[in-house]
Structure formats: structure tokens, C-alpha cells
A protein has these predicted regions:
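Long, distal/terminal scaffolding or interaction modules
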Residues: 1-297
Length: 297
């Protein structure tokens, strides 16, 4: 849990107003913006662009690009609807808490952003960001966190597809991820105590580690380098581990394992071990655990 502390209150307060003009509060500094609405027929862009050290509390956003190039900001108890497109780009040192955020392309090329207790529906959320922490939140997104670095996620309910592709240095714990094509081309990712549901999990990843996870879906974990599974279960998983360098300790049954490239896969039972149409050396070993004797067949 992040337990975000927002910035200290400021003497300058802007309260209970509506803004609709372009750059309405441009370069605002050391201020609190409270119970304000950013909407109207003027349809102005970039209402809070280039702000510094501000708190935005209980505000409504329905205009494009509201918080670009913001530095040291808190966004608390606020809402952004679908008209608030690309709302937070090139921002740094931000804290987002208890918000309902709907704008497409939320967070792009941002640095040091904390998100907690939020509900987010934003296709293309979090692209090319660095130092992102997310906790106790719900996110629906396609291409979640594409090509981002240094990410910590805890207690996330996530739904979408093509998630975490090309990410590096990611840690996820106690989360539910319902997403196809997750972790493709990722590097140095650890997922703990989580449910990971969706087809084609983790292809072409490097240094992907799953610990105490429930893995669900067809053809997972193929073409991986240095893949590790510790105390995981696998459901509806067929054609797993094709051409992967893998060391895995799996509890329960796997439908089928195909052409593991190297390493050892320990499993309670497997429906089929497939070794055919091999395009490269497939020297991985599959061992069946016989728990009552603690030996392997």
C-alpha cells in the first residue's frame, strides 16, 4: 500500500469556479484548486499546463490536455470524463488519489507518479513512463504501461489486453490481471501472489518470474529467456513453454507442454508432453512429482 500523502495546503486557494478558456490557469504555482469545473463551450485546452506545486481537490475535468508538464502536483477526489483526452503528459512528481479517470491516453512520458484508490478507464494508459507506483486501484486499458520502467503495482484489479509490453523493472503483487498478450518483450518482471488470466502470456520475455500465482489461459510462456515459476498453478494451459528457457515448480495439472528449450519443469501431472516440428534444440526436462514419496518420475 502506498499511503500517499498529498502536498501541504497552500494559502492561495481557487474555489467553486468554472473554467473553459484555453490555458485558464497556466503556470499556476503554490495553490489549491478546490471544487472547480473545467468544462464549457469554449472547449479550451491545457487549463493547468506548466503548473508547479499545486493541489487539485474535488474537481471535474471535461477538457483536453489539462495537466501537461505539471510538476509536484496532487490530484485528489477528482473526475476526468472521456472528453479529457490525453490528460496528464510529461508530468513529474505527481500524486493521484481517489479519482475516477476516463480520458484516453492518461499518463504519457511521466516521471515519479503515485496512483492509489483510483478507478481508471483509459486505453493506452501509462506509456513510456518511469517510476510509477499503483495501489488499490481498478484499471481497464489496452496496451497498459507500454514501454515503461521501474513500476510497482499492489492490489490492482486490471482488465484489458496487450498489457505490460516492453516494460522493464516491474513488480506486481496481490493483483488480478485479466489480459491477453501480457508481458511480451518485457524484462526483469516479478509477479507474486496474483491471478494472471489470458492467452499467450509472456512471450519473448526475459527474466520473468512468477511466484505463488494462478496462471490461466492457452499457450502461455513461449520463447522466454530465463523464465522462473515458483509454486504456481496452471489452468486451461495447453502448449505451454514452447522454446523457452525455463525452471518451473508447478502445483497441479498442466494440459500440455511443448518443446521447452532448456531447464526443468516440475509438475504434479501433465496431459501431454509434445516434442515435434522442432526448429531448435529442445532439451528442457519435464519431471512428474510424486508427492507422497517426494521423488520424481
Amino acid at each position: 500500500m502506498l499511503a500517499i500523502n498529498i502536498n501541504q495546503p497552500h494559502a492561495t486557494k481557487i474555489e467553486n469556479q468554472q473554467f473553459e478558456e484555453e490555458r485558464a490557469l497556466y503556470n499556476l504555482k503554490e495553490s489549491d484548486v478546490i471544487n472547480c469545473a473545467f468544462a464549457g463551450p469554449a472547449d479550451g485546452e491545457s487549463v493547468l499546463k506548466e503548473v508547479r506545486d499545486i493541489n487539485v481537490i474535488n474537481c471535474q475535468f471535461s477538457l483536453r490536455y489539462p495537466l501537461w508538464h505539471a510538476v509536484k502536483f496532487s490530484l485528489v477526489g477528482s473526475e476526468m470524463d472521456g472528453n479529457a483526452r490525453a490528460p496528464i503528459w510529461y508530468a513529474q512528481d505527481g500524486k493521484i488519489r481517489e479519482c475516477q479517470l476516463e480520458g484516453i491516453k492518461l499518463l504519457r512520458e511521466c516521471q515519479n507518479i503515485e496512483v492509489e484508490d483510483c478507478t481508471i478507464h483509459s486505453p493506452e494508459f501509462g506509456w513510456k513512463c518511469n517510476d510509477i507506483a499503483i495501489a488499490n486501484s481498478e484499471i481497464e486499458s489496452e496496451y497498459l504501461l507500454l514501454d515503461s520502467r521501474n513500476i510497482t503495482i499492489d492490489h490492482l484489479q486490471m482488465q484489458g489486453k496487450y498489457s505490460f509490453q516492453y516494460v522493464e523493472q516491474l513488480h506486481i503483487s496481490d493483483s488480478v490481471l485479466d489480459t491477453k498478450d501480457a508481458f511480451w518483450h518485457s524484462k526483469n518482471v516479478t509477479v507474486e501472489n496474483s491471478i494472471v488470466k489470458g492467452e499467450y502470456l509472456g512471450w519473448f520475455s526475459e527474466n520473468l518470474t512468477l511466484i505463488d500465482c494462478q496462471i490461466i489461459g492457452t499457450q502461455p510462456l513461449c520463447y522466454c529467456k530465463n523464465l522462473t515459476l515458483i509454486n504456481c498453478t496452471m489452468e486451461d494451459t495447453d502448449l505451454a513453454f514452447e522454446y523457452s528457457d525455463v525452471n518451473a515448480d508447478i502445483k497441479g495439472h498442466v494440459i500440455s507442454i511443448k518443446n521447452p528449450k532448456s531447464g526443468t519443469i516440475i509438475v504434479d501431472s501433465v496431459g501431454e508432453i509434445i516434442q515435434d516440428n522442432v526448429l531448435t534444440d529442445s532439451l528442457g526436462k519435464v519431471k512428474i512429482r510424486r508427492e507422497q514419496w517426494n521423488i520424481f518420475d
